[in-house]
Amino acid sequence: MSKLTEKEFEKIDYVRTSTELGEFVAEKDTMYGHAFFNMVNEYGIDYALSKMEEKLFRLKQLKKLGKMNHSESFKDSVKDLQGYALLTLLYIQACEEAEEKKKTQVNYTK
């Protein structure tokens, strides 16, 4: 993989890449019936961490085997790792929002 200059790095379109990642993850999550959220609900946050570790291990293996240059598999694994990180963040945010909602609800049953 070639190295970038600082000027080349500054030209990266973060918004476009983030939007594409979000669309990719949303489509895949819907296609799999929200399996990630169901599994995290059942097995806890360790499930999310194990999925990210699995992808990180795959990336390390591809690098070790010298298969990271121009390898779709390497790029796909990076996208999957990002996707699991995004899903984990969304899960955490949803849990925080649910907790906050519980705190602010007024209990009318007396």
Regions found by a protein language model. Give the residues of each.
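Intrinsically disordered, low-complexity regulatory regions
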Residues: 1-110
